[in-house]
């Protein structure tokens, strides 16, 4: 649709994702398939279309996917390991694909949010969420959007996973 309307594609942002909170031994085959289908396959197929269009344009472009900081730095006892495995797969894809398409100036990057002020965390008191980051503040949707825009415009950045999590990814603090 964007191609028909504008005639080209400069950037793709893949923001589809689901998150199932279950202990590892409680995930079913259907749970895994749903996670893999949405979190991995969805990105693969839309990115393939974008790459083909960018190749046809011969102008390069930027592909940014939204992953999760927990994929790299899980919270002890957090029951979302399989969901984070799929997000970690996206992080690996960004590194691999950026290498594969760098010579064509097609860049792949990811934004890995931590805890975000969103409906997903609406029932958790904000002061508790803020304690999960060294900065003592909660990531906003606007923080994520700013990181995405930055990566789409930063022509010399490829293969990066940008953590937008108030410093939580730096480890024990």
Residue map of PLM features:
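A short, exposed helix-loop element centered on a Lys and neighboring polar residues
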Residues: 47-48, 95
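C-terminal substrate-recognition "lid" of short-chain dehydrogenase/reductases
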Residues: 106, 140-164, 169
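Substrate-binding pocket helix/loop in short-chain dehydrogenase/reductase
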Residues: 23-24, 31-36, 121, 129
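Active-site loop of short-chain dehydrogenase/reductase
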Residues: 8-10, 54-69, 78, 103-106, ...
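Conserved Rossmann-fold SDR core element
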Residues: 8, 85, 91-94, 100-116, ...
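Conserved NAD(P)H cofactor-binding loop of Rossmann-fold oxidoreductase domains
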Residues: 15-20, 167
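Catalytic loop of short-chain dehydrogenase/reductase
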Residues: 64-89, 94-103
């Amino acid at each position: 649709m964007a191609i028909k309307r504008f005639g080209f594609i400069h950037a793709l942002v893949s923001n589809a994702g689901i998150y199932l909170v279950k202990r590892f031994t409680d995930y079913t085959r259907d749970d895994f398939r749903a996670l893999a289908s949405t979190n991995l396959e969805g990105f693969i197929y839309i990115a393939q279309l974008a790459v083909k269009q960018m190749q046809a344009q011969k102008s390069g472009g930027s592909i940014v996917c939204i992953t999760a900081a927990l994929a790299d730095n899980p919270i002890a006892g957090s029951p979302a390991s399989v969901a984070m495995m799929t997000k970690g797969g996206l992080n690996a894809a960004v590194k691999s694909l950026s290498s594969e398409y760098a010579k064509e100036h097609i860049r792949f990057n990811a934004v890995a949010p931590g805890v975000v002020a969103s409906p997903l965390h609406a029932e958790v008191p904000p002061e508790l969420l803020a304690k999960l980051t060294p900065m003592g503040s909660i990531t906003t949707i606007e923080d994520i959007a700013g990181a995405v825009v930055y990566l789409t415009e930063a022509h010399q950045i490829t293969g990066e996973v940008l953590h937008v999590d108030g410093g939580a990814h730096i480890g024990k603090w």
